[in-house]
Amino acid sequence: MVMNVYRQIDRSDLQFDFLLKEKVDDGYEQEVKALGGHIFYVESPKKIGVKNYIKNVKAVIEQNGPYCAVHSHMNVMSGLIMFSAWLSGINLRISHSHSTRFTNSFPTIILGKTLIKIFANKKVACGQKAGKALFGQSKFSVIPNGIDTAKYYVYDENTRSILRRKLNMKLDAFQICHVGRFVDVKNHKFILEVARELKNDNVNFQVHLLGDGELFDEIHQMANEMNLEEVCFHGSVENVNEYLKASDLFILPSKYEGLPVTLVEAQSAGVKCLVSNGVPTEADFNLGLMEALPLEKDIWVTRIKQCVSNKKRIAQSDIESAIRNRGYDIKESANKMLEVYL
C-alpha cells in the first residue's frame, strides 16, 4: 500500500524514506532509490530489546532528517515508533492500523496501544474494524488500500491465455492463487490440506503461492512430503497483477485480516474470491466475487470444486464502478494520504 502511494505522489513536494526490520527484494530497493527515497534497517525489538530498538529508531530519524512526519504501519508495535519519533522532536506522528487482531503478548498489546494513544497525534486505518481494533474509541481516519486499477483489468480470454503461457501455467488446469507472507495467520497449512483433498478427488488444478516469510521453507517442505506438485512456490514477485489476471480463483483462508489489498486487487481483476470468516466484509465489492467460508476443509474443497465447473465473469464496467464508489483507486487513496500529512 505504501509503495502504491509513493509511486503516485508528487515527489518534488514530498519524499518518503523507509525504516524496515528486515531485508526487502533488490527490486524494491532499486525502485525506492530511483524515486529519490532511502531505505534504513533496524532489527526488531524481539532481537535487540525494546530499549535498543527505541535508541536505534531515534538515531535513524535524527541522523537522516529532518523529517516532517513519521508514519508507522506496524500495528501495535507502532507505539514504540511513535515514542521514538516524539523523543526525536517529530511534530506529526501517524499510527496506521492494518489488522483487526494482534498476535503479540497481552502486555505488549497494552503497552503499544498506550504509547499510540499518548504519542500518536494522527491515527489512520485501512478499514473501520482495523481502526477500532487498535485505536478503540479514539478518532481515526479510514483510507482504503488503493491500487493502480489499470494493472488488473482483463479485457478478454486471449489475454488470460497469453499470461498463462508467460507464467508457465497449465492452460487446461483450474488456476488458484494466494498472495501473502508465509506467517501463521495466513494459514498456508490449511491451503495444503485443501490441495491434498482436491488432488485425491482428481481435480485438474494448480495453486500458486506468492510471497515469502519465516514459514516459507517449512511450508515448502510440507508440500514436498505431501507430494503436492500442483502447489507452486514463487516467492516474492513484482508482477502479482499478472498472476491474478491469469487465475480462476483467489483464496484467502487467513485466521484474521485487516483489509487486505490483495483481495481488492483480485476483485479488480474480476477473479472469484473465497475467503475465511476472519476477513472483514467491508472488503467485498458486492459483485458476487467474494464469498466468506468457515475454516472447515471439507467446505472449502466442495466450494472450490463447484467453482471449477462454474466459471463466471463480471462485466468490467461493473468492476470499475465498484472501485470508484469504494475509494480503492490509488489516486484517490494517495490524495487522502497527502491530506493526512498536511
Q: Which residue ranges define each predicted feature?
A:
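A conserved mid-protein helix/loop that constitutes part of the nucleotide-sugar donor-binding site
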Residues: 1-4, 174, 178-197, 214-217
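N-terminal strand-loop element at the rim of the active site
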Residues: 4-55, 214-215, 340
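Short hydrophobic beta-strand element within catalytic cores of glycosyltransferases
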Residues: 19-20, 263, 272-276, 282
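Acidic anion/phosphate-binding donor-loop and adjacent secondary structure
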Residues: 46-52, 132-137, 146-166, 171-172
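Short His-centered aromatic/hydrophobic patch
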Residues: 72-80, 97
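Nucleotide-activated donor-binding/catalytic signature segment of Leloir-type glycosyltransferases, i.e.
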Residues: 220-235
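Aromatic "clamp/platform" in nucleotide-sugar-dependent glycosyltransferases that forms part
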Residues: 236, 255
